[in-house]
Amino acid sequence: MITVVGSGRVGATTAAMLGVLGVDNKIVLIDIIKGLPQGEALDLNHMSSILGLDVYYTGSNDYADMKGSDLVIVTAGLARKPGMTREQLLEQNAQIVANIGKEIAKYAPDSVVILTTNPLDAMTYVMWRATGFSRERVVGFSGVLDGGRLAFYAGQKLGISPASIIPIVLGQHGESMFPVPSKSFVFGVPLDKLLKPEEIKEAVEETVKAGARITELRGFSSNWAPGAGVAIMAKAVKRDERRALIASVVLDGEYGVRGIPVEVPVVLGRGGAIKVLEVELSPEEKQRFQQSVEAISKLLNSLPAQYK
């Protein structure tokens, strides 16, 4: 059983993608707004009927209904508004995430948690502390989205399908995220060998600004790409695929970092992020990575004491 906490745009889209991909046949939506998860669940059950899917959705306002879940996906939290940075959401969403984390520890103590709430890396830390889970079992959704965006923009410039590109994006899920063209490949050929320097710069800038651009255009943040990305991560966990994906996890010495969640390649399986993969970086890339880590550390230091 999978529980999705938060029935807004990202939560509902994620729930739909989970059903379409056949990740689980029982999905619970939980939200504090009465009627919202129940309405979404009913609509999703109608979708399942039309598509012939073997999945049943339940909506609830009670955290106790996550009992039995081996995977909990947390999409709850305040969303970014036009002109707002992920960092401005810090304190308000920290309280929301910490409260949800305590409920997860109570009702789904053996689960893996995938989190989408921004600012992502800081909220991954808050969730890790609130649940008391091992670092492997608290995974921030970030790199699948950032990597997908990099592949899209690079693919447009190359005139090839984004599916042909294996992208690498490291560091913070935010303004200091660090796409790595030298380690992003098209059949073994790095992007920085296929694109001109100015094209790489444009693709990287478009990747970094993509989320804000979507919010600016339509007045609310992204949901389709995050929903798809979370579902891909959930499938890797539920089916024990041992699939290498980019995610935010608390590092324990990898990349010379300890106790800070950072967007890095991991192997996702039934236990969560069962292995961190260390990418060899050039001196310049290491410097940029460290700058991104410092940005995350600064956010963590600004968290109220009760969330540390």
From Swiss-Prot:
The keyword Ribosomal protein does not apply. It is an enzyme of class 1 (oxidoreductase). Pfam families: Ldh_1_C, Ldh_1_N. The active site is at H173. GO terms for biological process: lactate metabolic process; tricarboxylic acid cycle. It catalyses: (S)-malate + NAD(+) = oxaloacetate + NADH + H(+). The keyword NAD applies. GO terms for molecular function: L-lactate dehydrogenase activity; L-malate dehydrogenase (NAD+) activity. InterPro entries: L-lactate/malate_DH, Lactate/malate_DH_C, Lactate/malate_DH_N, Lactate_DH/Glyco_Ohase_4_C, Malate_DH_type3, NAD(P)-bd_dom_sf. Belongs to the LDH/MDH superfamily. This is Malate dehydrogenase.
